[in-house]
């Protein structure tokens, strides 16, 4: 086992909070490992005056960090999963996630409590085409203007009257301790589905780095890991970018996800040495369709299979047409459910 880890991350206050949360998890299992934070400025951080869909999409928040991973300048990278494209460079893999926080969006406005209450032709600051599509579905009269920057800068722009309102992720507001119920109002899932992976902190490594894989297997939150599979499969199949209004949110239907633990994935190896070797080989592999590495449930010990319901949204490029779909599946077939939804909805949106 390694004695130290170089952890790559963006330099934003929220990214550093995420990184320290990952370090806390690592220290729980490996208290003697030294964790060095390596802040990296990404292209997405440098270019703030243009919408992401004009400059390369959310991958711009990962490009330099992933290159540092490939160049072995860092051992592990921390991302907001919502910024991770569906397709990851082949030598890399999302090997762990932390427990998902509340992924809902928040309507931030000094005078009004909801999108519906805004006056005619009010201005909402948002660069996300997903949010723009939902806003225009609810209130087609509203003007949605490009609104980039970190959480603090966006709130300052709101306070100075640059826009009438904005929409931000609850998780970021909470972790930065700037959620104020006086002007921050949660938006329910029924009104606005969250971004794929929103509320999830992801850990990316080189897939051949066994030391990092061992660490990731320990810190990985399996209930969240299972939930994001249909969301990520949906994203990967559509090869969606920042020009495509797309959303998905998964939740367990019949069980408390905290009950899904590593014990449920305990593997029992019996038989001759060849069988043992085969079982050991199968216990760690990459699911190519989602870019996730995980331990296969060779023996599931809980009494019933966990069921997952995922709500999907897909719009056309200009946001004038939006379609919704819901899939219910168990954890063994959740990836296939995401692909199935993508195929059906793509056909519907193209009609």
From Swiss-Prot:
Q: Which residues carry this modification: S-(dipyrrolylmethanemethyl)cysteine?
A: 242
The cofactor note from the UniProt entry for this protein is: Binds 1 dipyrromethane group covalently.
Please list the GO biological process terms of this entry: protoporphyrinogen IX biosynthetic process
What's a single GO MF annotation on this record? hydroxymethylbilane synthase activity
Q: Which Gene3D superfamilies match?
A: Periplasmic binding protein-like II, Porphobilinogen deaminase, C-terminal domain
Q: Which family does it belong to?
A: Belongs to the HMBS family.
Please describe what this protein does. Answer: Tetrapolymerization of the monopyrrole PBG into the hydroxymethylbilane pre-uroporphyrinogen in several discrete steps.
Q: Which NCBIfam families match?
A: hemC, RPE1
Q: Can you say what this protein is called?
A: Porphobilinogen deaminase
Gene encoding it? Answer: hemC
């Amino acid at each position: 086992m390694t004695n130290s880890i170089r952890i790559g991350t963006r330099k934003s206050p929220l990214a550093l909070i995420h990184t320290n949360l990952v370090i806390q998890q690592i220290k729980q299992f490996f208290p003697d490992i030294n964790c060095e934070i390596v802040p990296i400025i990404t292209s997405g951080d440098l270019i703030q005056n243009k919408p992401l869909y004009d400059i390369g999409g959310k991958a711009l928040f990962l490009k330099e960090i992933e290159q540092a991973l490939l160049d072995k300048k860092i051992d592990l990278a921390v991302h907001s999963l919502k910024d991770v494209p569906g397709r990851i460079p082949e030598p890399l893999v999302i090997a762990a996630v932390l427990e998902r926080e509340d992924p809902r969006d928040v309507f931030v406005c000094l005078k009004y409590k909801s999108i519906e209450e805004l006056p005619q032709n009010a201005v909402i600051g948002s660069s996300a085409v997903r949010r723009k599509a939902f806003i225009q579905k609810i209130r087609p009269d509203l003007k949605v203007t490009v609104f980039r920057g970190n959480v603090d800068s966006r709130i300052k722009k709101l306070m100075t009257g640059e826009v009438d309102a904005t929409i931000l992720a609850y998780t970021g507001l909470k972790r930065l301790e700037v959620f104020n119920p006086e002007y921050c109002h949660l938006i329910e899932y029924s009104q606005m589905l969250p971004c794929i992976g929103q509320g999830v902190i992801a850990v990316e490594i080189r897939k051949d780095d066994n030391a990092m894989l061992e660490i990731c297997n320990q810190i990985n939150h399996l209930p969240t890991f299972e939930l994001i599979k249909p969301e990520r499969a949906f994203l990967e199949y559509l090869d969606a970018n920042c020009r495509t209004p797309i959303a998905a949110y998964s939740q367990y239907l019949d069980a408390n996800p905290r009950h899904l633990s590593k014990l449920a994935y305990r593997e029992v190896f019996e038989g001759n040495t060849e069988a043992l070797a085969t079982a050991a080989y199968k216990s760690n592999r990459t699911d190519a369709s989602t870019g996730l590495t995980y331990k296969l449930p060779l023996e599931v010990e809980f009494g019933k299979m966990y069921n997952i319901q995922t709500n999907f949204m897909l719009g056309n490029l200009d946001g004038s047409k939006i379609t919704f779909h819901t899939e219910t599946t168990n954890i063994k077939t959740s990836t296939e459910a995401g692909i199935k939804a993508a195929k059906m909805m793509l056909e519907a949106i193209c009609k």
